[in-house]
């Protein structure tokens, strides 16, 4: 067996010795067996040839060099591509951030400007009140001291002030100047004493005569009922008593304690003058004063009728400006809706990685420019309307209109709206319309536990979204807030809400979850449901003020 096995083995060895070439080829054909020795023999066979004639490396060295070059080139391309994409992202963020900053800063600047104007108006009103009080004190002191020059100086200041206010010297201007002089002559101190009464108490006949010429009444009463004649007789000023009697002072007028000027007179000469005075002269003077008062009343009535005629054209102007303002707000509302659609299209293109982002971004820029232009036009229209209303109020001489509804500050909104302290809202029966030109009320309500709906964005005004907001507010007993901003969007919201005529349980659908089952609508939570409307328009349309309860937000420390 061993010899048989040995013969093939020896034969194989002999075959390998006689034919070494096939063995090498056979060994090379077997994968993984003798390849490394063959590679080593190959390099050893090439070494003498390399030493004799140097050549470029071939085979695996070329592959490694090619891979290194390709790797370096790809890294370079990747770095450049990364830098390009970073630059594009930076430019995109800058392009998106700049409009966002401007959109955020624009209302802030408007709020600051509105607050500055309100503050300046309040400061001007306070300054005018202080100056008026100072003039009154100067007038009262000058009347008591008999300083006629100071009295004339105060009257001259008032005339100059009326001139600066634009009051002319025509019939209407003279009527207004006369009314101002009479009001200044009848001004009172904290005790109800007029300048004429102070002049009588000081015994100043010239000052008494001057005040009477300006229209002051010689029979005015101060605290506890003393007349100027009473005070002059009590002080023993004979000349002042005589002048007052000639001007129509009635010696029969009693004070609150029942005493007459004759009883409190401190000098016998004053008593004798009062006793010997002819009362028929007093009656004649009283009739003349009554006739003068009637004449002034008739002049005031004629002046009022003339003002009403002039206000007719101004009323038409206010109506025209109101229509223009409503048209501007309507166009601005449409522009806001278009901007929201453009932003939604841009977001969808980015999410789907489409190559139309540049087009959508340019469309957003164009729409934002249109919104800014329409916003400025609406602001100008609102300012023109406010000035026309102010001019109309000044012409009718009605002063500042008494704004209907409630007034509160931002810090009091929780008590007024959420708690309804005093049951003012419940007693009125209307839902509140919060009027806040600065927008602080909207920020306050947004961060409360409320369902906040931004009416400028058309998405929340869809029936499905509004239905969920209303149902959620009823289910969890939360206020539902509609922010109208600067636009007149109340009719749009009203149409959406009036479309829901059923009761809240009829709003439920089979697809709703268990949290909206009928058993979850508890009466205790439903009592906390509120409906609020917030607007930045200072003077909303009359229709809104009739349907809703106005709640005006004032600045801290002011009456505005």
Swiss-Prot record:
Intervals holding ANK repeats: 191-223, 224-253
Coiled-coil blocks: 281-398
Domain IQ: 62-91
Location of the region described as Disordered in the Swiss-Prot/TrEMBL record: 1-72
Family matches, as InterPro entries: Ankyrin_rpt, Ankyrin_rpt-contain_sf, P-loop_NTPase
Keyword Secreted in record: no
Lineage top rank: taxon: Eukaryota
Pfam families: Ank
Record keywords: ANK repeat, Coiled coil, Repeat
Name of the featured protein: IQ motif and ankyrin repeat domain-containing protein 1
Gene: IQANK1
């Amino acid at each position: 067996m061993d010899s048989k096995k040995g013969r093939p083995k020896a034969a194989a060895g002999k075959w390998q010795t006689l034919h070494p070439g096939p063995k090498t080829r056979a060994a090379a054909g077997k994968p993984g067996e003798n390849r490394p020795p063959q590679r080593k023999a190959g390099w050893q066979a090439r070494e003498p040839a390399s030493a004799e004639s140097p050549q470029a490396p071939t085979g695996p060295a070329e592959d490694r060099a090619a891979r290194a070059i390709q790797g370096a080139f790809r890294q370079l391309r990747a770095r450049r591509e990364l830098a390009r994409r970073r630059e594009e992202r930076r430019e995109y963020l800058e392009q998106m951030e700049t409009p966002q900053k401007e959109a955020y800063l624009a209302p802030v600047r408007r709020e600051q400007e509105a607050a500055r104007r309100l503050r300046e108006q309040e400061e001007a009103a306070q300054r005018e009140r202080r100056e008026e009080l100072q003039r009154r004190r100067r007038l009262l002191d000058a009347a008591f001291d008999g300083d006629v020059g100071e009295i004339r100086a105060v009257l001259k200041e008032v005339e100059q002030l009326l001139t600066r206010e634009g009051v002319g010297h025509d019939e209407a201007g003279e009527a207004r100047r006369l009314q101002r002089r009479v009001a200044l002559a009848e001004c009172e101190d904290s005790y109800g004493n007029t300048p004429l009464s102070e002049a009588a108490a000081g015994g100043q006949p010239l000052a008494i005569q001057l005040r009477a010429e300006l229209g002051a009444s010689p029979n005015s009463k101060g605290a506890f009922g003393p007349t100027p004649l009473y005070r002059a007789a009590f002080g023993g000023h004979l000349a002042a008593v005589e002048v007052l009697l000639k001007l129509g002072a009635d010696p029969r007028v009693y004070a609150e304690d029942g005493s007459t000027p004759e009883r409190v007179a401190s000098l016998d000469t004053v008593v004798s003058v009062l006793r010997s005075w002819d009362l028929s002269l007093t009656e004649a003077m009283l009739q003349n004063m009554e006739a003068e008062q009637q004449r002034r009343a008739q002049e005031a009535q004629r002046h009022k009728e003339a003002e009403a005629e002039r206000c007719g054209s101004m009323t038409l102007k206010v109506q025209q400006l109101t229509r223009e303002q409503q048209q501007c707000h309507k166009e601005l509302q449409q522009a806001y809706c278009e901007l929201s659609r453009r932003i939604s299209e841009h977001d969808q293109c980015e999410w789907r990685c489409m190559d139309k982002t540049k087009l959508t971004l340019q469309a957003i820029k164009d729409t934002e420019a249109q919104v800014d232009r329409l916003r400025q036009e609406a602001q100008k229209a609102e300012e023109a309307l406010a000035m026309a209303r102010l001019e109309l109020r000044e012409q009718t001489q009605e002063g500042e209109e008494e704004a209907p509804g409630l007034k509160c500050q931002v810090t009091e909104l929780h008590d007024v709206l959420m708690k309804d302290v005093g049951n003012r809202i419940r007693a009125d029966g209307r839902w509140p319309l919060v009027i806040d030109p600065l927008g602080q009320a909207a920020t306050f309500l947004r961060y409360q536990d409320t369902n906040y709906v931004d009416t400028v964005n058309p998405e929340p005004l869809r029936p499905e979204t509004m239905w969920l907001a209303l149902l959620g507010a009823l289910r969890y007993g939360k206020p539902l807030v509609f922010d109208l901003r600067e636009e007149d969007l109340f009719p749009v919201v009203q149409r959406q809400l009036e479309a829901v005529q059923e009761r809240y349980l009829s709003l439920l659908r089979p697809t709703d979850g268990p949290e909206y089952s009928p058993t979850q609508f508890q009466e205790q939570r439903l009592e906390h449901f509120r409906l609020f409307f917030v607007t930045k328009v200072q003077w909303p349309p009359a229709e809104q003020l009739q349907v809703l309860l106005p709640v005006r937000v004032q600045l801290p420390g002011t009456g505005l």
